[in-house]
């Protein structure tokens, strides 16, 4: 079964109403203004849904008409609420749009959301007691995302490769410049200018082959990196992922986690 509305159910159940019936004292919110006005000390359950489907990319968040809090904002408010529980708490925070940015071959969006994820981690560190709070940071998989060439120090990470000792663009054997960042597969090169929603790439055909990037601004939000193999969507990779931890028991967590 399918529905023309994203996130709509086809069995006629309204889970929001069901939740409100179970928790009549609970607070349901779906926009920034309600989020900002939350009473974090009431102890009432909170159910927050800010989008029909996925949250927006961090770079695209300002285009949400109803307003959408950032990952770090949600982390801070959630910790304030959970901290009222004398028995402690478990909180899982996921920055899922990093994954989606990579699938779209949009390093700009993937890295912008990674920066916001870093802010959320720092928010968790700043708003918890290190003596009794274990914080673990990891990933569930990697992506076929590479750093290529030998760009000189200071070269923009989203830019085209300029080799050490020169001011000229480095070029492949095909005579075309290339970016520091690229993907093994995916929809490949697209230039959408200042577009901040990486998912726009799925409304076009995957790009085949190389593109002449000489006069393309590869640092713009709407630039999608080249891919060696054209696919509708970039794939996950197979390398182990890093695991970081701080707090009680952190000494038991180190190194990498094997992907399954």
Predicted feature locations:
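A post-motif C-terminal structural segment
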Residues: 1-260
């Amino acid at each position: 079964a399918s529905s023309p509305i994203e996130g709509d159910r086809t069995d006629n159940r309204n889970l929001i109403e069901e939740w409100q019936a179970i928790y009549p004292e609970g607070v349901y919110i779906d926009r920034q203004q309600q989020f900002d006005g939350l009473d974090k000390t009431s102890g009432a359950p909170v159910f927050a849904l800010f989008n029909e489907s996925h949250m927006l990319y961090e770079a695209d968040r300002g285009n949400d008409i109803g307003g959408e809090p950032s990952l770090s904002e949600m982390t801070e408010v959630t910790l304030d609420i959970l901290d009222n529980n004398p028995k402690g708490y478990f909180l899982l925070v996921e920055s899922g749009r990093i994954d989606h940015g990579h699938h779209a071959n949009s390093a700009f969006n993937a890295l912008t959301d990674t920066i916001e994820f870093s802010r959320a981690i720092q928010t968790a560190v700043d708003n918890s007691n290190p003596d009794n709070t274990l914080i673990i940071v990891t990933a569930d998989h990697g992506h076929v995302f590479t750093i290529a060439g030998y760009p000189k120090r200071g070269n923009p990470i989203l830019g085209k490769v300029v080799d050490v000792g020169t001011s000229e663009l480095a070029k492949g054997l095909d005579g075309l410049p290339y970016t520091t960042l690229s993907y093994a597969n995916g929809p490949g090169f697209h230039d959408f200018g200042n577009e901040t929603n990486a998912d726009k790439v799925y409304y076009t055909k995957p790009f085949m082959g190389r593109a002449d990037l000489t006069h393309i601004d590869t640092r713009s939000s709407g630039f999608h990196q080249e891919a060696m193999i054209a696919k509708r969507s970039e794939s996950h990779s197979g390398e182990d992922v890093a695991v970081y931890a701080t707090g009680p028991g952190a000494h038991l967590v180190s190194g990498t986690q094997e992907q399954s």
